[in-house]
Amino acid sequence: MNALGLGQTYTVSARFDKAVKLIRGALFAMELSVVGEVDTSGTFARENGKKTEPAKILLVDCPLMVFEAQALDRAAGVFFPLHVLVWGDGDRTHVSTVSSGELFDLRLPLGAAGPMERLQARVVMALESVSGSKDGGRGVDCIRPEGPK
């Protein structure tokens, strides 16, 4: 199970704290809610003794989509919210999305599939909308998708 290999990964040309603010603003503009946040700094250290970079998991949902999914199938609620992984890498920040269904290779209940697809699409649009903003007026795109590794 590799969470980072599942979804599209983006790179933000900003330090971690600024990137998190940009991402939160873009999600809010798409009428999405960050219902929870888990600080995972130090959890994924690559080497012992090396300073760990900051990392967070933002739990993102849209109450209307969750309501729709649960109205069609009450079991659908366990697949929400969507996990947005954000981790620092020096002057850059990486962002990736992972849903519970993708993480464990599960087929979503019929009632959850449509709302989850729409939620994922809105999160992707929010992340891509940040690419239109400029970093400090220098004309540098703040976020761009990374290619396959």
Predicted regions and their residues:
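Beta-strand/loop substructures that line and gate deep hydrophobic ligand-binding cavities in soluble
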Residues: 82-109
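Compact, glycine-rich, soluble single-domain proteins
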Residues: 35-82
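Short Gly/charged-rich anion-binding patches and loops
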Residues: 21-22, 39, 72, 122
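A generic structural signal for alpha-helix starts
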Residues: 14-18, 64, 114
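Terminal, regulation- and interaction-focused segments at domain boundaries
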Residues: 1-30, 34-36, 132-136, 140-149
